[in-house]
Amino acid sequence: MSKVVHTSGKRKTAIARGTVKEGTGRVKVNRKPVELYEPELARLKIFEPLELAGDIVNSVDINVRVVGGGIMGQAEAARMVIAKGLVEYTGDMNLKDRYVQYDRTMLVGDPRRSESKKFGGPGARARKQKSYR
């Protein structure tokens, strides 16, 4: 039986779930090959963990499904799933260290969320100006 690893990752309001299993190096995000992912900046973000991993990528298939959030939030959530999945699949601590040194958010989530808007102004903190005359 082949080894299958399920992982999940979040960024802002985007949630990604993915599987890493034995294969031929195919990487798909929302059922599309990652090479066709647009815009280019988001595609490059998703490619980062694959390039840092080296030859390991050619022996696994990665499928990622992302929902919610915006384009870059989804890209960073997918990137986290790929990085976590490869580390768990290989069990390689050197790979984990390489990811952490490159960018810690590849493996560790970013807890920041946007603050909700309150009444009395246009945003979360901004208020209507007062005139004292």
Swiss-Prot record:
It comes from the Archaea. Residues 111-133 are annotated as: Disordered. One of its GO terms (biological process) is translation. One of its GO terms (molecular function) is RNA binding. InterPro entries: Ribosomal_Su5_D2-typ_SF, Ribosomal_uS9, Ribosomal_uS9_archaeal, Ribsml_uS5_D2-typ_fold_subgr. GO terms for cellular component: cytosolic small ribosomal subunit. Keywords: Ribonucleoprotein, Ribosomal protein. The keyword Ribosomal protein applies. HAMAP family: Ribosomal_uS9_A (MF_00532_A). Belongs to the universal ribosomal protein uS9 family. This is Small ribosomal subunit protein uS9. It comes from Methanosphaera stadtmanae (strain ATCC 43021 / DSM 3091 / JCM 11832 / MCB-3).
